[in-house]
Amino acid sequence: MQQGQMAYDRAITVFSPDGRLFQVEYAREAVKKGSTALGIKFKDGVALISEKKVRSRLVEKTSLEKIQLIDDRVAAVTSGLVADARVLIDFARISDQQEKVTYGSLMNIENLVKRVADQMQQYTQYGGVRPYGVSIIFAGLDSIGPRLFDCDPAGTINEYKCVSIGAGKDQVTAYLEKEYKENLSEDEAIRMGIAALKSAVADESSMKEPEIASIKMGETFHVFTSEEVSKYLN
Amino acid sequence: MQQGQMAYDRAITVFSPDGRLFQVEYAREAVKKGSTALGIKFKDGVALISEKKVRSRLVEKTSLEKIQLIDDRVAAVTSGLVADARVLIDFARISDQQEKVTYGSLMNIENLVKRVADQMQQYTQYGGVRPYGVSIIFAGLDSIGPRLFDCDPAGTINEYKCVSIGAGKDQVTAYLEKEYKENLSEDEAIRMGIAALKSAVADESSMKEPEIASIKMGETFHVFTSEEVSKYLN
Amino acid sequence: MQQGQMAYDRAITVFSPDGRLFQVEYAREAVKKGSTALGIKFKDGVALISEKKVRSRLVEKTSLEKIQLIDDRVAAVTSGLVADARVLIDFARISDQQEKVTYGSLMNIENLVKRVADQMQQYTQYGGVRPYGVSIIFAGLDSIGPRLFDCDPAGTINEYKCVSIGAGKDQVTAYLEKEYKENLSEDEAIRMGIAALKSAVADESSMKEPEIASIKMGETFHVFTSEEVSKYLN
Amino acid sequence: MQQGQMAYDRAITVFSPDGRLFQVEYAREAVKKGSTALGIKFKDGVALISEKKVRSRLVEKTSLEKIQLIDDRVAAVTSGLVADARVLIDFARISDQQEKVTYGSLMNIENLVKRVADQMQQYTQYGGVRPYGVSIIFAGLDSIGPRLFDCDPAGTINEYKCVSIGAGKDQVTAYLEKEYKENLSEDEAIRMGIAALKSAVADESSMKEPEIASIKMGETFHVFTSEEVSKYLN
Amino acid sequence: MQQGQMAYDRAITVFSPDGRLFQVEYAREAVKKGSTALGIKFKDGVALISEKKVRSRLVEKTSLEKIQLIDDRVAAVTSGLVADARVLIDFARISDQQEKVTYGSLMNIENLVKRVADQMQQYTQYGGVRPYGVSIIFAGLDSIGPRLFDCDPAGTINEYKCVSIGAGKDQVTAYLEKEYKENLSEDEAIRMGIAALKSAVADESSMKEPEIASIKMGETFHVFTSEEVSKYLN
Amino acid sequence: MQQGQMAYDRAITVFSPDGRLFQVEYAREAVKKGSTALGIKFKDGVALISEKKVRSRLVEKTSLEKIQLIDDRVAAVTSGLVADARVLIDFARISDQQEKVTYGSLMNIENLVKRVADQMQQYTQYGGVRPYGVSIIFAGLDSIGPRLFDCDPAGTINEYKCVSIGAGKDQVTAYLEKEYKENLSEDEAIRMGIAALKSAVADESSMKEPEIASIKMGETFHVFTSEEVSKYLN
Amino acid sequence: MQQGQMAYDRAITVFSPDGRLFQVEYAREAVKKGSTALGIKFKDGVALISEKKVRSRLVEKTSLEKIQLIDDRVAAVTSGLVADARVLIDFARISDQQEKVTYGSLMNIENLVKRVADQMQQYTQYGGVRPYGVSIIFAGLDSIGPRLFDCDPAGTINEYKCVSIGAGKDQVTAYLEKEYKENLSEDEAIRMGIAALKSAVADESSMKEPEIASIKMGETFHVFTSEEVSKYLN
C-alpha cells in the first residue's frame, strides 16, 4: 500500500483523487471472506443455494442457515459480517411488514431491495459510521414473475438471471456464464447451481449438505429438507 | 500529487489556497468513470441516449437501464456511482410528487432540477458528508417547451441544446459542437446522438443496443423498444 | 506557502497568529476566478452589467445569465462558485417574500443585503462548514433612492456609487475610480460600465453580448433585450 | 504490530484494507482474559458451568457469581469486562420484562439473544463508542426445547449443543469436541462440563467451587447450592 | 513561533501550559488591524470619535460609518472584522428591544454590555466556533449618568473615563493618559479626542472627516453632521 | 511508555491490541493518589474508617470529611478526584430519593450501587467524556443484612467482608487478608480497621483523628464524634 | 515540557498515564496570574479583602471591583479570567434567585457553592469545552453561622477559616498559617488580612486602596467605603 492511498482510506466520507471510496472497497473485502452462495432463475421460479460451513459438530445446524425468509414469497442469502447481515435482514423484514400494515399488501420485491440498498448507501456517505460489510442476494416472486437481485456494500443493486456472492463468487460466475441456459427446469437449475458451487468451494465438507430454497409460480418459498437436498448431491 | 495538495483535499469543508474544493473535483473523477450518455434537443422535443454496458449475459437487461422517468414528462440519465444516482433520482421523484400533492400540478422542470442541485450543493458545504459522485442529465417538456439540463457533483446546473456526461463526455461534446444544428427532426437528432456516442465509446459491445428515450410536444416521454432502437443502428 | 501558514489554514474556525481567517481568504480566490461584473449608479437609478462567458454554442443562453431579479425592484449579480451563488440568491428571494407575507411590504434593500450577509458571516465562524465561495452585487430602488451594495465571502457589506466583482475587479475599479462622475445619465453610465468591463476582460468573446439590467426612479427593474444591448456595443 | 495496522485500528468505524474491524478483534482480547465458562445441552435440558475465581477471602462469594438469571427460564454467563457484562445483562432483563408487559408473555429466547446482539452490533458500526468487551452464553427453555446461544463483541450469535467462552475456551471446546455425545443425562452433562473446565483452567483454586445452574423440561432454572455442587467435584 | 506554541493555539477550547488562550489572543490581532476609535466622557455626557478610512471615492460615505446607534441613548463604535461587528451590534439592538417589549423599559447600559460580552465569552469556551474578532466601545446615558464601556474578544468588559480601540489604541491611550482631565466641557472633550486620534493615525486622509457622536444629560444621542464635524478640524 | 501504547491511550473509546482500556487504567492512577479508607463488616453491622489529611490548620475540619451519608442507612467513602466524587455522591442521593418518591421506599443498596456504577461504566464507553477518577465504598443495612461494596472507575462493583481504596489500599488489604475474622464485635472491627490503616498510612498526622462511621442492625448510620473516635486511638 | 506530556495535555477529556488532567492544571495557571484576594473569618462574621490593580487612571474604579455581592448575605471574590468570572458570578446569582422563587427562601450557602462547583466540574469532564480559568472565594452567613469557601477550576470546594486565591496565594497562606487566631474581632481580622496581602503583593500601588467587605451576625454584607478602607491602611 502506498502512502498516497493511506491518506484517503481512513476517512469514510472523502473521495480519493481518482474518485474512489476506499472504505467501500475494504468492506467488499469482508464480503470476499464470506461463504459462497448463489441465486439462479428457472422457467417458472428462482432458487437460492449456499454452501454450509460446519465449523464444529457442537454448533446447531439451524444456527448455520444462510438462507433467510423475508416473507413467504421472498428469501435472502448473505455473505460477509454475520452480525451486519442479521441487522439488514431484520431491517428488510420490518420494512416489508410496515408496508403490509400501512397499505394492506406486501412490498414489490424491487422496492424492498431498494429500501435495504438505500440504507446501505447512506452508510457510505455520512461520517461517523462504517459501511455494512455484507452482500445480499434477494430472490422471490412478485407480479412481474421470478425476481433475483444482489446488493453490495456500496448500496448498488442489480437484477440477474443468476448471481453469486462470497469467497467463490468469481469461479461460480465463470461457471454459470459458460453453462447457464434460460428456461431450465427447477431440477436442472438446482443441479447446475450445485455444480457451480462445487467448482468454487475448496473445502469439500462445506458442500456435504448445502442449503437450498426455491419458489415456483403460484407457490410460496420452500426451504429444502435434508432428504430433499441429498437427492441433488450425486 | 504534491504535499501541498494533500493538506487540503482530505477535508471536504475547506478551500485550498487557490480557492478550489478538491473533494468536489475528486467526485467528478467518479463521474468520469461512468457510462457515457447525452441529451439532444430537436425541433419539437428532446431525446436522451445512453450506451448500455452489458457486463455479463447473466444480468437482466432492465437492470442496466440508465434512463429513468421522473414522471411522464421528465426523464433523467445518470453517470457515476450507481447507488448515489438511485438515491438522487428517488429524491427527484419524491420532490415532484410532493409538489403535485401540495399544489395540484407537477413542478416546473427548472425548479425540479434546482431542488436536486441544491441537495447536491449542500453535500459540498457541510462537514461529515461527502459530495454525491454523480452527474445527471434532465430532459423534458414544460410550458416553456423542450428543456435539457445537467447537474454535476458541485450542484452546478446549466441548460443546453445538447449535453453529454460520463467517460466519453469530451469526445461527444466535440462531435456535437461541430455537427449540431437547430431544428433537427427527431430522427436526425437521434441519429446524430448515436453517431456522437459511437465516436466516444471504445467498447463496441456497449453500443449494440443503446438506450433511447424522447418526448415530443403534446406527448409523454417514450422509452424506445428494442425494435425501435434497432432501426437507428445501421 | 510556509509551514506556519498550513497549520492555521485548514480549520475554518481558528485565527492565525496575526489575526487572519485563511479559509475566508481562500474563498475570495474562488471569487477571483469568476466572471467580471459591475454595478453603477446614475442620476435617477442604478445599472448592473456583466460579461457573458459563452463556453459553448451548445449551452442555452438563458442558462448563462448572471443577473438575477430578487423582486421587481432589486436585482443581483454574482461571481464565484455557481451553485453557492444560486443557493444565496434563493435565500435572498425567500427572505424577501417572507417579509412581504409577514409585514405586507417588501424588505428595505439594506436589510435584505444584511440578511444574506449574516448568513455568509455565520459560515465563517462555525465549525463543520466552509464559507460561501461567492461575492454578490445587489442593486435596487427603495425609499432612500437607488442603492448599490456588495457582499463578500466574509459577510462584509459596503454601499457604493459603483462597484465590481470577479476576475477583472481590480481593472474595472481602477477605470471607474478615474472616470466615474456623479449625475451621469443612464446612457452615460451604461456606456462607461461597458468600457470599464472591456478594459478588464481579456476574452473578447465574452463581451460580445454582455448582460445589462437597470432600474430608474418610479419604474421596475428592466433586463435589456439583445437589441437594447447591441445599441451600446459600438 | 506493523505500521500499516496502526493506521486502521484506532478508529472504530473504518475497515482495514483487508476488510477487518480491529477494534472488534481487540475487544475479543478482553474476553480472552475473562474467566472460563461453558454451556452444555442434555437430553431434556441445558446446564451452565463456570469457574469461580476467588481472588481474596475478603470478597463475598455472591459477588463472584458469573451465572445470572434473566428470568426463571433463561440464564446467562459472561466473560470479559465485568461492568460491560452487567450493563448488557440488565439490558436483557429489561427487554424481557418490556416484552412481558407489552405482550403478556416472555420473549422467545432467540429473540432475546438477538435484541442483545443487535445492541452489541451497533457499537461496532457507529463512531464515538467502543464495542462491548464481553461474550455471553445464554441458556434456557422455550417452546422449541432447550436452547443454548453465545454472543460475541461483534454481535454475532450462534446456537450450540455445547459452547465455551473466556480464557480456556479453546481447551474446553477441544475437550467437548472429542467427548460430547447427544442425549446425555443431566448428571453426565454436568460431569463432562466440569471435566472439560478442569482440563482448561490452570489455577486449581478456581475450580474448588465452580458455579452450576441448569434447567429441565417443565421446570425453572435452578442454581446449584454448595452441597449440590460438591457432589460433582470428585 | 515555537513548536510548543503551535501545539496549543489551533484548538480554541484548550489552555496552553501557562494558562493562555491563544485563539483569543489572535482574535485581538484582528482588532489591532481595525480603524482607531475612542470614547471620552465630559462633564454632563459622553462622546464617541472614530477615524473614517476612505478607501475609495466610489464607496458611499454612509457605508463607512463606524458609529452605530443601539437606541437613542446608547451608541457603539467597533474595530476589527466588519461582519462580526455587524452581527454583534444587531445582537445588542435585539437584546435591547426584547427587554423593552418584555419589561416596558430599555435595558440598563451595563446589562446590555454584559449581554453582548457573555455572547463573546461563550465563543471562547465552546468547541466548534471561533471567538469574535472585534472590540466594541459602548457609550450612553442611564440613571447613573454617562457610561462608557469597552468589550474585547475575550468577553472582558471595563468601564472608563476614556478608552480607545483599534490600530492606534496604544498611542491614543498614552495621549489621553497624559492630557485627560475630568469635568471637561463637551467641546473640550471632542477637541481632545480629535487631537488624540490625530496623534495615532498615520494616514492623514482618514482624519479629514472623522465621525463624532455625543450624548448630553437630558438629551438623546446626536450624530454630528459634516458641518458640525468640520468646526473641530482646525 | 512505549510508542505503541501512546497510540491507544489518548482516545477513550478504543481498545488497545491486547484488549485494555488505557483511560480507565489512568483514572485508577488518580484514585491511587487519594486518601486511604476502608470498610469492614462485623457481627451485626458494618463500619467505614478513613484517614483524615489535615493539609492546613486554616481548613475547616467538616470540609475534610470523606465519609458521606447517602441516607440514614447507607454511607459512602471516596478516594480520587474530589469534585468527581461529590458529583457521584449527589447522583447517588438523588437516585435514592427519586426511588423513595416513586415507590414509597428507599432503594435496595445493591441497586443503588449499580445505579452509580452504570453511570461510571457509560463514561468508559462513550466518546467526548473521560471516566470518573474516583473509587467509592458503599456500606449500609438492608433487608439482607449488612452490605459492603466498592465501585471503581471502570464501573466494576464487588461485595466484600472488608475492602480498601486509595493510596494505601494494597497494604490495608494485605493486613486484613491476614487478620480479618468473621463475627467480630463492632469494637474489634473498628480497632482492626484502625490498625490496618495505620499500617498503610505513612503520614502519621493524618491518623491523628481518623473518621469513623458505623451502622448496626436496627439502628441508623452513626458518624463518630471526636470523643468516640479518640477512644480507639491508643 | 516533555513529548510525553504534550500527547495528553491538548485534549481535555483524557487522563495522563499518571492520572492527571493537564487542562485543569493549566487553567490553574490562569488563576495564578490573577489578582490576590483572601477571605477571613472572625468571631461573629467573615470578611473579604482584595488588592485593587489600578492599571490606568482612565478606568472607572467601580469597574475594577473584584468583590461581588451574590445577595445581601453572600459575597464572592474571584481571580483569573475576568469574563469567565463574570459568567460564573451571574450563574450563582441566578441559581440563588431561582431557589428563592421556587422555595421562598435563599439557598444554603454550601448548596450555592456546590451548584457553581458542579458547573465547573462538568467543564473538566465533557469534550468540546475548556475548564473555567477562575477560582472563587464565597463568604457569607447562613443558619450555621459565618461560612467561607473556595472553589477552583477542577470544581473542588473546601471550607476555611481563612483562604487566599490569585498570584499571591502562597505568601498570603503562609502568613495566615503563622498568624491567624480564632475569635479575632472584625477589626483584628481585617488588619491581619491587609498585612497578609501586603506581604504578598509586589506592586505597592495595588494596595493603595484595597477592597474590603464583611458581614456580621444579624447584619447584611457591607462593602467598605473609601473612608472606611483608609482607616485600615496605616
UniProtKB/Swiss-Prot annotation, chains A, B, C, D, E, F, G:
Per the record, the coiled-coil ranges are: none
Protein origin, superkingdom = Archaea
Annotated GO molecular function terms are:
threonine-type endopeptidase activity
Q: How is its activity regulated?
A: The formation of the proteasomal ATPase PAN-20S proteasome complex, via the docking of the C-termini of PAN into the intersubunit pockets in the alpha-rings, triggers opening of the gate for substrate entry. Interconversion between the open-gate and close-gate conformations leads to a dynamic regulation of the 20S proteasome proteolysis activity.
Q: What is its main location?
A: cytoplasm
Entry's family note = Belongs to the peptidase T1A family.
* The protein's name in its UniProt record: Proteasome subunit alpha
What organism does this protein naturally occur in? Picrophilus torridus (strain ATCC 700027 / DSM 9790 / JCM 10055 / NBRC 100828 / KAW 2/3)
